[in-house]
Amino acid sequence: MTCEVKEKGRVGTINPIFTCQPAGAQFVSIGIKDCIGIVHGGQGCVMFVRLIFSQHYKESFELASSSLHEDGAVFGPCGRVEEAVDVLLSRYPDVKVVPIITTCSTEIIGDDVDGVIKKLNEGLLKEKFPDREVHLIAMHTPSFVGSMISGYDVAVRDVVRHFAKREAPNDKINLLTGWVNPGDVKELKHLLGEMDIEANVLFEIESFDSPHSADGSLVSHGNTHHRGSDRHRQCPTFPEPLRRHQGRRVSAEEIRRSRRSSARPRSHPQYRHLPAEPEEGDGKPIPQSLAHERGVAIDALADLTHMFLAEKRVAIYGAPDLVIGLAEF
């Protein structure tokens, strides 16, 4: 048997890693400590997304599924959610936050996920786990609406609504990083640290770039404690990657605090946007160390541009959070 390789005629690249809303909600869930999300739908709705995360971050992540089958589509799959919550809490005694993430199939069927959560709170949790802190959060993310970008938005909104409380401000700012990499979170923390600004990093993924340890004790888990969302209500909000976050709107409206939005800074070139905004809200001057770092970055760009990029036109595509930061300087 012979094999003939044919080159395709297209000159563009099709990006397969731009999927539906449940992916965004799952990304939020893995950024919360002691949290495992249950995707209420077919197994593929979680397996594909978990594969995306594992291939990109080269780490393993814990996500569960209600494993919806044909009989559930006909007779109703709410019982699968109840069983999934029971099994999950029994197998993982440290789990405290369980988002119930809907999919296209369960939304079309019309499953009353909010009603199931109320039933579980009044029944299973009191009877089988009476002394345990468990938070069940409904996240409605039908796949036929929006994308993984808006799914992240919806999940942020639901977590904020569930946990955050109106209390006295603590003069911190909130940082919603969006679809970024662990190194980006580390860099954003560096910026804030240089400016001596205290911040709550919500749905934090810096630990996804976890080191290899001989005893295997270091694993990748989100670093945002669910009680950290209580503090979310107490402080002004900080510009998150895009200008569309419902979570930003919810927190700002309910606690009457300021909200700002900006493109995510990509490395140092966009320092001209980032430092100005915390300075406006915090009143602290931009340190010379950041001005120096930005100058070095711009100098490196200038050194390369005239050699390789002069009179060139390029197309930048990808997640909006990343593309805006790359292109807008």
Swiss-Prot record:
Domain of life: Bacteria
PROSITE patterns: NITROGENASE_1_1, NITROGENASE_1_2
Enzyme class: oxidoreductase
Catalysed reactions listed for this entry: N2 + 8 reduced [2Fe-2S]-[ferredoxin] + 16 ATP + 16 H2O = H2 + 8 oxidized [2Fe-2S]-[ferredoxin] + 2 NH4(+) + 16 ADP + 16 phosphate + 6 H(+)
UniProt keyword annotation of Transmembrane present: no
Quaternary data: Hexamer of two alpha, two beta, and two delta chains.
Family indicated by similarity: Belongs to the NifD/NifK/NifE/NifN family.
UniProt name for this protein: Nitrogenase iron-iron protein beta chain
Source taxonomy: Bacteria, Bacillati, Bacillota, Clostridia, Eubacteriales
This protein's encoding gene: anfK
